[in-house]
């Protein structure tokens, strides 16, 4: 088996409209397709610079998940940005709290974390 790339990332949200606004209007992802499925509500396919796809799902009453970055399972999603400082200012201007900017001791690159509307940890890393 040979894996070429990550095909998509699936995220289940508790408030579809709030999460849609966050990923589309705040983070700037492009809507590829929005589908309503009566038994499971919405599925939103999002694109990041023509390369990656995030599937945003809404289900009736999804159970909560442990969101600690150190818990088993998916730790966080990380996105590359040109400028950490500009990105943090933008997020803060849009009422999204960010952690203090840190420097990775191995790569010497700047990074920080913030959270989506369902408390999923998201990281931005400077290019």
Range-by-range predicted roles:
Residues 1-2, 45, 88-127:
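Vicinal oxygen chelate
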Residues 1-18, 74-79:
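N-terminal beta-strand motif that seeds the catalytic metal site of vicinal oxygen chelate
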Residues 5, 40-42, 50, 73, ...:
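Exposed loop/turn and edge beta-strand positions of beta-sandwich/beta-sheet ligand-binding modules
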Residues 12-53:
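Core segments of cupin and vicinal oxygen chelate
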Residues 22, 85-90:
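Short amphipathic alpha-helices within nucleic acid-binding modules
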Residues 32, 40-42, 61-67, 100:
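A short, acidic/glycine-rich surface segment
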Residues 70, 77-85:
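Mid-chain, well-packed structural core segment of small domains
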